[in-house]
């Protein structure tokens, strides 16, 4: 049986990107691969969603980017988390935890 690949909830992609980039400088393809690996193949980020999100996060000042060479020898844009991005990640993680706890409370409710 194949694995169902879930669509990301609206608004969670930015948080996931910030979290992955917090681990160290990484290029766009590396971000999508890391999300897929860490989620045990459940989450898959399409390029059509990833790159607009990266540009948006960079424009907001949450990510900084520099050009470098990828493992394959190709020129790639590497992203790192800015101080502003680190603060935003903390805020988003806090909000996510609060939301997750609220959903869990509802799911545990006995009918």
Where in this protein do the model-derived segments appear?
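N-terminal helix-turn-helix DNA-binding core of bacterial DNA-binding proteins
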Residues: 5-49
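Intrinsically disordered, low-complexity and often Lys/Arg-enriched segments
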Residues: 1-2, 111
């Amino acid at each position: 049986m194949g694995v169902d690949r879930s669509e990301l909830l609206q608004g969670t992609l930015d948080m996931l990107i910030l979290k992955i980039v917090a681990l160290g400088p990484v290029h766009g393809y590396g971000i999508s691969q890391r999300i897929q690996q860490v989620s045990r193949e459940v989450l898959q980020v399409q390029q059509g969603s990833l790159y607009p999100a990266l540009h948006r996060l960079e424009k907001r000042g949450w990510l900084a980017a520099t050009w470098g060479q990828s493992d394959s020898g190709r020129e790639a844009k590497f992203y790192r988390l800015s101080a502003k991005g680190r603060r935003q990640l903390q805020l988003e993680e806090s909000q996510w935890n609060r939301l997750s706890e609220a959903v869990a409370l509802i799911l545990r409710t006995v009918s």
